[in-house]
Amino acid sequence: MALSGTRPSQYKSSHYEVKRSLIRSRDRQRQRAERLQQQVEALKAENQRLRQDLQQAAEELEMVRTLQPFEDAVSPLDSLATRLSEFHIAGHHYSATMIALCINLARDVGFRQAETSLKALVEALGLPIKVPSHDVIRNWCSRLGVSELRNPFREDQDVLWMADHSSQIGKEKVLLIIGIALEDLPQPGETLALEDMHVLAIIPGKQWKKEDVGREYQKLAAKIGAPRYLLCDGATELQDPAKELEKNGKKTVVLTDLKHHAANVLEKLIGRSERFKTFLSEVGLTRNRVQQTELSVFVPPPLKVKSRFMNLAGLLRWAGLASYYLDQPQSEIRAGISDERMNEKLGWLREYGEDLICWTACQLLINAALRFINHQGLFHGAAAQLRQELAQVMRYLPKANEAVNFMRDALVDFVTQSEQKLEAGQRVWLSTEILESLFGQYKRLESQHSKGGFTSLLAALPIFCCRVTPALVQRRLQEVSTTDLNEWVQTTVGPTLTSRRTRAYREYDRAMAGQVSQAI
């Protein structure tokens, strides 16, 4: 293989050229390094800016998250303000939404309190809304109540009436009748609610004999049809007239409230014994002895004269509590109370240990029976199921005695007799607790007026048995005007005790003013 003919001298350079080349290379590297350094500094600056932007974005995001709940709260308030200020109902200065809100609030807290609460809310939120006065709110409630007194049932429906009368000051009583179609009863396992019921009649009166109640039953039956069933307490003036009612050839079946019946059984069983009377006497003395002492935590509940055996559970529970702490000297509740003081004021309860066990067991059976009826209703087979329920309760009671067994049998026998009155396949109710609840709601609304006899506020009673919505308000207030309300009050309530008192004082003031002018 031939070698190349190129000479080595052709690739040799002078030292000068080599140095110059190296210097040029160094300068180029330095310039490149400077450019890279400038790029690095620029990138660092950009990175710092991006970090600052990221930090600012994070802070803004945190601010948004912090303010979001307030924005969420303000948005509905803006919507509420819009709805409360929407178009007014014809003849009114307020919207249906505002009126419905006022009525619902008044049902819970009262008329004056509703006005005060709304004013505080509107001012706190800065809403540009005018709040109605308590008198206006009362007028709305009363008009809505009168409009609800209508026939809510179809001709072909089987209906259950519940009737009772409530006393007020003097001889005044009001007969209240509410109703529900059997097909609208709650499903087994559920309880009746006020909104399930319809107020059918509100009739004040000074006396309620059989003929008086019968007259009102007949008037209501002529208006909306007779009920298939009527449920009330054991008062003959309520029960006997109902037996004369009839619809489609079928007589109205009269049922007795389980709670009233159970209270009567309990009274006959223990209430007439000297032992129980002595116990009540000791309770009254104990109340006076401990209520202003360090034992005030053990003050017994006040004794009720009326319906005492319908409200005995609270008293028996107190007796159990006080008896328990007699033997718990180290408990926190007993701090500062010596054994000597406990025994001096409450030691007498030890003498009634066995009695309290028996009485409490009877009350527990009543509670279980009421719980069963209030969730299942009355039907064929109810008594058998109730017996099983009571057997379960008795498993956890101390040793049963004759009185406890008697109470169990009395409850089951009563339900057996009641279910035998039903038609095959029908299910009704055997508790008027919903009616008592309605009376309670009304008296709470009535508040200070309850000491002045029944007033025009009776017109508002039906509002507790309806779901008050803007749509309902829009419809009902167009049906009943203030003039219609005044006519209803004049016809139904008439001159009230409050109005008679006002007139008496007015005449007295005029007479006194006349005497003063003559003297001058």
Regions found by a protein language model. Name each.
Residues 43, 124, 232-245, 285-520:
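Acidic/histidine-rich catalytic cores and adjacent linkers
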Residues 24, 70, 77-100, 111-112, ...:
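RNase H-like nuclease fold core
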Residues 1-7:
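N-terminal membrane insertion elements
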Residues 258-284, 429-440:
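RNase H-like two-metal-ion nuclease catalytic core shared by retroviral integrases
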Residues 7, 11-14, 18-28, 32-70:
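Heptad-repeat coiled-coil/leucine-zipper oligomerization helices
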Residues 119, 142, 459-462:
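Short amphipathic alpha-helical surface patches that mediate protein-protein
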Residues 28, 32, 60, 117-121, ...:
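A generic secondary-structure signal
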Residues 106-122:
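Short, charged amphipathic recognition helices of the HTH superfamily
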